Amino acid sequence: APQGAAVVSPTSTLMAEGGLTAEEVAEVLDLPDGVDPLAFNPFADGVDATAALAVEKISQQIMTAVSSFASAAEGAGASETGAFEAALTSVVDVVKVKADNLTDTTATAAEKSIDFTAAADLNLIKAKVADAAEAVVTAEGTSGFNKAALTALVDDTATSIKNVNDQIEAVADLTSDATKNVFSTLQVLNEQVKTAAETQKAGGTGSIAFTNA
């Protein structure tokens, strides 16, 4: 998170990694009016419940995208740290392009915002993941990375992210057991994706159950 941030969150991390302002991130992510990514804690006492729900859902969706693409890269042979860096870089690069478009009068609304339930936006991210992972692996000197295995799984990984993020989008509160169950599916998805990539790397055909969720 940027220096001076009161909370560390996926949104503040995007700011720090992308060199973006709070205003740019809030607009690209379509955060509720008045929400400061550096200070807003959806679980703090007295926060607006509607804003808290919206912000936490977006945070969960960002984490689903980053961690799932990272799991695919790790399963294909990248280090855990390198895989996360590659996935985060892929997301940040797309967000930065959207932020640059905020001042472009010819850009469409979709080109100025990111929706982690939209296949089109997830496709922009997935197109960067394999190259980003390869770059990180090369810089680290990690051996055993199989780019083809990762490339073979990015489509299903993106589809699975969309399916889980659609479930997150449908959440109506932050406290019910149903919500906690939805938020906990992220870990299950990550394990499925990593295992599928490991299978692909070993010469098999990896599959992700959440592709059909």
Predicted segments with their positions:
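Feature for extracytoplasmic/surface-facing segments of secreted or surface-associated proteins
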Residues: 1-213
